[in-house]
A protein has these predicted regions:
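Gly/Ala-rich phosphate-binding loop of Rossmann-like dinucleotide-binding domains
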Residues: 57, 159, 267
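Glycine-rich phosphate/adenosyl-contacting loop at the front of the ribokinase-like
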Residues: 1-64, 75, 247-248, 315
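Conserved phosphate-binding/catalytic loop of the ribokinase/pfkB sugar-kinase fold
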Residues: 88-93, 101-145
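Active-site metal-binding loops of divalent metal-dependent hydrolases
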Residues: 9, 146, 257
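Hydrophobic anchor at the start of a short beta-strand
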Residues: 3, 62-63, 87, 165, ...
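Conserved phosphate/ATP/ADP-binding segment of small-molecule kinases
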Residues: 159-240, 247
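A glycine-rich beta-to-alpha transition motif near the start of alpha/beta enzyme domains, typified by
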Residues: 62-89
Length: 315
C-alpha cells in the first residue's frame, strides 16, 4: 500500500572552513563584509520528504512524494527513479530553483546556514498524484515540514479524500498559530515530534504528549540518542522504544529515517510499537552513517536487528 509524503525535497551544499569564524567576525558586525575560504565542498540530496521516502523504499515500501522541484530538479528525479520511487506526485517548475540549503562550518563546529525554499513555495500548484489514470488512493499520509501553506493544503486534501495522516511537526512549529496546530492535530490520526518540538507544541497549545494520547491520538516522541516513546490511545502511559546501540557519526536526518521506518510498518499493517521499533533501527543505521540518505539499509538487516533486540519480528 502506498504512503503519501508531503514536505521538503532539497539540495544541501556544505562548505568547510579550516579556521574559526569568530576570528573574522569580531568587532562591529553592522557593516559586515568578509569572505571565508572553504577547504572542501560537497553537495548532498536532502529534504524531509525525500529522506522519509528513501528510508521507506529501501525496506520495500511504496512512498509517493507530493511536492515541487525547480529548474535544477532533474538530478533529484533521476535519483528517485534509480531507487524505484514514484515521481508521479512531483512537478518541476522552470522559473525557480529547487529548495536549497547552503551550510558553512568551521573547525570548531560552528555553523552558518542559508535556506532558500524556492520551488517548495509552489507545492500547492502541484496536482494530486495519479496512478494508472486514477487519483492516487494511499493507505495513509505524513505531513512533514515543507512550509505552512503546503502543510495546511495537504491536510485539507487528505481530510477531503478520507486519507488518515500523521502530523510531523518538525522545525516549523513557529509558523503556525495555536489554533492552526490544534486543527492539524485534531484532524490527524497522530503526531510525531522530538522532545524540543513537543515542548514548543505544549507551550503554544497547552497539550502535552500524555494529554494528546488521552484524546485518542497516537503520539511518537523521539528522544535523540535515548530512543523514543509512544503514547497510544487508551494506554495509561508511554511505551518506551529502545535505541539500537551504534557508533554515531551524524544524527542529521535520523528523525526522517525514524519516520520512514515507522510508516513502513504502519502501511504493512503492523502495530504502532512494532512499527516504531523498525523506525528506531532505521534511525540507528542512519546515525551510523555521515549521509542523510546514503546509508546501508535492507529489510533483512532490519529484521535481524529487530530479532536481536526484541525477539520474533513478525514481518
Amino acid at each position: 500500500m502506498s504512503v503519501l509524503i508531503t514536505g521538503s525535497v532539497a539540495y544541501d551544499t556544505i562548505f568547510s572552513h579550516e579556521g574559526e569564524f569568530a576570528r573574522q567576525l569580531s568587532g562591529d558586525l553592522r557593516n559586515l563584509n568578509t569572505t571565508f575560504l572553504a577547504s572542501s565542498m560537497r553537495r548532498d540530496f536532502d529534504g524531509c520528504a525525500a529522506n522519509i521516502a528513501l528510508a521507506m523504499k529501501r525496506l520495500g515500501g511504496d512512498p509517493v512524494i507530493w511536492g515541487a522541484l525547480g529548474m535544477d530538479g532533474e538530478d533529484y528525479l533521476a535519483r528517485f527513479r534509480s531507487f524505484g520511487i514514484s515521481t508521479e506526485g512531483l512537478q518541476c517548475f522552470p522559473d525557480v530553483y529547487t529548495a536549497q540549503c547552503v551550510i558553512f562550518t568551521d573547525s570548531l563546529g560552528s555553523q552558518l546556514a542559508v535556506f532558500h525554499p524556492g520551488a517548495m513555495n509552489r507545492s500547492r500548484e502541484v496536482p494530486w498524484p495519479r496512478r494508472e489514470g486514477k487519483d492516487l488512493r494511499p493507505k495513509l499520509a505524513i505531513l512533514s515540514p515543507g512550509g505552512k501553506t503546503t502543510t495546511l493544503n495537504a491536510a485539507n486534501e487528505c481530510v477531503s479524500r478520507g486519507i488518515p495522516y500523521l502530523f510531523d511537526v518538525g522545525q516549523e512549529l513557529n509558523l503556525f498559530s495555536a489554533e492552526e496546530l490544534e486543527s492539524l492535530l485534531s484532524r490527524s490520526f497522530g503526531i510525531a515530534y522530538s522532545d524540543f518540538e513537543a515542548e514548543g507544541f505544549e507551550a503554544k497549545t497547552g497539550l502535552s504528549s500524555e494529554a494528546i494520547g488521552r484524546t485518542g491520538k497516537l503520539v511518537l516522541r523521539t528522544h535523540g540518542s535515548r530512543g523514543a516513546s509512544l503514547f497510544l490511545p487508551g494506554a495509561g502511559g508511554a511505551v518506551p522504544v529502545e535505541p539500537l546501540p551504534v557508533a554515531a557519526q551524524n544524527p542529521v536526518g535520523a528523525g526522517d529515517a525514524m519516520r520512514g521506518g515507522f510508516l513502513y510498518g504502519l502501511a504493512r499493517g503492523l502495530d504502532p510499537v512494532a512499527s516504531a521499533r523498525i523506525g528506531a533501527i532505521v534511525a540507528a543505521r542512519k546515525v551510523a552513517s555521515p549521509s542523510a540518505q546514503d546509508y546501508p539499509l535492507t529489510l533483512d538487516g532490519v529484521r535481524k536487528d529487530y530479532e536481536g533486540m526484541w525477539g520474533a519480528a513478525g514481518f
